[in-house]
């Protein structure tokens, strides 16, 4: 409405001024009208235009408010997370065995995963590869039950994850992502977020194995150094090393890693890679891989394209197939187009 009112208001105003100016000038020349009276009429027209312009602006604000309100109502009408299964089950001693059995999933009516079958034994590494936007995080979202599978099941140590309390399920995982998050507080407080009752010695040991203790010790306040709200007083690489240390402190059985190390110097990148290798040792790991050189030893590689799983296997078998994975591999190491 405002997009119509505003130009229409301007058109009417300028037409009125033009008509008054022409007629008024003729009357002034005829001696029946004073120049001051003509100026007054034109000023009156401008004064009438002001409230009309305000109405137009108000209309635009009301429209924006209604648009925002409709989105809020739409969000409030969204179904909350599916209620927990009753009675819930528990895993007393998590081993880290993960099974995807005939998993089918898709957003809305679109089917992405059609029949995923993967058996991941405790301590094994699963790499998820594919171009940007291929849907690599979909598997992670299913593991953490941000979405439920349409059919089939995902099991941890033989227990369907839909039968586990969400809080218990998500506590089994440790995460190190490319987009790290640290909150406003001391380094020690940020690390202890994964284990609230950790001792100072445990915190320091976690930092040592994550190759970040030396950096922390060089700071004037050490582990009591306050990270500002934007985390801008430490580098991106240091943030990633701290999140690796936080994962060590939690000591989870299952890991989710995003091994990308963009925007860091070479030395820090090497430390991050070493830290992740240490972290994965003896733990079931799901790695969102961007550089295929880092996942050659993966027990299983899931290859995704356009949201669908197109290939599945280990590094050697996928190269032998000479399919999409082999094309990605050559594009990185031989400079060929895929």
Where are these regions (language model features)?
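Residue-level signal for transmembrane alpha-helical positions in Major Facilitator Superfamily
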Residues: 13-20, 64, 96, 199, ...
């Amino acid at each position: 409405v405002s997009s119509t009112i505003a130009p229409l208001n301007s058109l009417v105003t300028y037409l009125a001024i033009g008509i008054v100016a022409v007629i008024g000038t003729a009357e002034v020349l005829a001696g029946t009208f004073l120049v001051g009276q003509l100026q007054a009429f034109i000023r009156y027209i401008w004064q009438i235009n002001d409230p009309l312009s305000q109405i137009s602006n108000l209309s635009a604000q009301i429209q924006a408010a209604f648009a925002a309100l409709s989105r809020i109502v739409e969000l409030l009408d969204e179904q909350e997370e599916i209620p927990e299964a009753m009675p819930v089950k528990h895993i007393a001693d998590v081993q880290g065995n993960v099974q995807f059995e005939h998993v089918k999933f898709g957003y809305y009516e679109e089917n992405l995963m059609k029949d995923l079958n993967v058996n991941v034994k405790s301590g094994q590494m699963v790499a998820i590869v594919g171009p940007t936007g291929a849907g690599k995080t979909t598997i992670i979202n299913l593991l953490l039950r941000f979405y439920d599978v349409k059919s089939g099941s995902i099991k941890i140590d033989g227990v369907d994850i839909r039968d586990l309390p969400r809080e218990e399920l998500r506590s089994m995982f440790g995460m190190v992502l490319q987009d790290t998050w640290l909150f406003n507080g001391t380094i020690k407080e940020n690390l202890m977020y994964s284990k609230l009752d950790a001792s100072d010695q445990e915190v320091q040991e976690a930092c040592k194995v994550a190759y970040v203790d030396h950096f922390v010790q060089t700071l004037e306040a050490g582990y009591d150094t306050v990270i500002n709200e934007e985390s801008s007083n430490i580098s991106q690489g240091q943030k990633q090393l701290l999140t690796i240390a936080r994962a060590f402190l939690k000591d989870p059985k299952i890991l989710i890693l995003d091994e990308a190390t963009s925007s860091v110097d070479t030395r820090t990148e090497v430390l991050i890679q070493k830290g992740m290798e240490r972290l994965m040792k003896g733990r079931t790991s799901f790695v969102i891989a961007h550089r295929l050189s880092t996942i050659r030893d993966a027990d299983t590689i899931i290859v995704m394209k356009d949201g669908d799983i197109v290939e599945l296997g280990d590094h050697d078998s996928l190269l032998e197939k000479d399919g999409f994975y082999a094309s990605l591999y050559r594009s990185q190491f031989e400079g060929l187009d895929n």
